[in-house]
Amino acid sequence: MTTIARAAAVSPDALRETFSHFPQAVALIGAEVDGTPLGLVASTVTAGVSLDPPLISVAVQTTSSTWPLLRAAPALGGSLLGAHQSLLVRQLASKDRASRFSGIDPVITTDGALTIPGSPAHLWTRLYNEVEAGDHTVALLEILDTNSLEGADVRADDPPNTDALVFHRREFKGLPAP
């Protein structure tokens, strides 16, 4: 048996390094608010939190200036971003909110949920609940509808690559489909 002494407190840098070993799905949570497309990129989305009601969770930094606007929207779209969208994710995550959707033609539902075309999977949701969790807010989103680029859902103009984009070891990487 080996006995070790643990540090009194874990540093944020040590946590980031440890967490970087966990591949995380990358998604855009979006809505049109007052005629303006808004969205935030999250790598803290947890699918399958609950099947009844159907819920996902997303952790949002409490310093986000976009979340207060999104949380008030009647509906939110979720786009699971694909490996072919790795360059797009940097634009969507830009601190410059006005340029995030420059050159992008998002799909917006009548209730304002915003999704990115060509993403491997989409969710249409609404805010179910929020929980304060340290420097983040964990938002539970109730899933109202879904689709994915598989089988009958594939459209002629969709990209052939539906591999998921993940954030792993502080880089965006494609996660190949089986």
Give each language-model segment a name.
Residues 2-178:
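Basic, polyanion-binding surface patches
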